[in-house]
């Protein structure tokens, strides 16, 4: 029976050992805690900085929209403009540009074929012989990505 008591004592720490472990854990916790970050700005200064940053962001956004309005023919500077209207009219204009670009490329190819008397593949952009690519400069070839269509 005394062996059983000794085994229990070795398995279970005594009260003094528990207090010692708790003290060590408390010291570890104290070392891990960080002091609260001290903000050098007052609440008023923080608010003023936030307001001025937001104002700069809005001004930049307005300037970009103004540039877009100047470029897209359907948008007039004097009309009231919502972002949605600007996006939709810009998308419509870009689609028109893609279609127009494709028509012009086909006209160039047709004129070339009429001059040379040869016919090219159905998709001149994909043609590998180089003749069509020489006719139409690379910067003039616009292609819509997969899943996109010119409305």
Swiss-Prot record:
Role: Transcriptional activator of phospholipid synthetic genes (such as INO1, CHO1/PSS, CHO2/PEM1, OPI3/PEM2, etc.).
Q: What else is known?
A: Present with 521 molecules/cell in log phase SD medium.
Q: Name one GO cellular component term.
A: nucleus
Q: What Gene3D superfamilies would the database entry show?
A: Helix-loop-helix DNA-binding domain
Q: Which UniProt keywords apply?
A: Activator, DNA-binding, Lipid biosynthesis, Lipid metabolism, Nucleus, Phospholipid biosynthesis, Phospholipid metabolism, Transcription, Transcription regulation
Grouped into one coarse class, the protein's main location is nucleus
Localization: Nucleus
Which Gene Ontology molecular function entries are recorded, alphabetically? DNA binding; protein dimerization activity
UniProt source species: Saccharomyces cerevisiae (strain ATCC 204508 / S288c)
Pfam families the record matches: bHLH_INO4
Example GO biological process: phospholipid biosynthetic process
InterPro entries referenced in this protein's UniProt entry, alphabetically: bHLH_dom (IPR011598), HLH_DNA-bd_sf (IPR036638)
Q: What is this protein called?
A: Protein INO4
Which residue range or ranges hold the bHLH domain?
45-97
List the biased-composition ranges (Polar residues): 116-131
Renumbered to this chain, region (Disordered) spans 112-137
Give the gene that encodes this protein. INO4
PROSITE patterns xref list: BHLH
Instruction: Give the highest taxon in the source lineage.
Output: Eukaryota
Subunit structure of this entry? Answer: Efficient DNA binding requires dimerization with another bHLH protein.
């Amino acid at each position: 029976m005394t062996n059983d008591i000794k085994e229990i004592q070795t398995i279970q720490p005594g009260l003094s050992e528990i207090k010692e472990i708790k003290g060590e854990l408390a010291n570890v916790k104290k070392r891990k805690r960080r002091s609260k970050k001290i903000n050098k700005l007052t609440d008023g200064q923080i608010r003023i900085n936030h307001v001025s940053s937001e104002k700069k962001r809005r001004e930049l956004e307005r300037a970009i929209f103004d540039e877009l309005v100047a470029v897209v023919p359907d948008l007039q500077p004097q009309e009231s403009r919502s972002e949605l209207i600007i996006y939709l009219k810009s998308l419509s204009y870009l689609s028109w540009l893609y279609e127009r670009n494709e028509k012009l490329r086909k006209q160039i190819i047709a004129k070339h074929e009429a001059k040379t008397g040869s016919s090219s593949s159905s998709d001149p952009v994909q043609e590998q012989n180089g003749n069509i690519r020489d006719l139409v400069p690379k910067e003039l070839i616009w292609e819509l990505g997969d899943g996109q269509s010119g409305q």
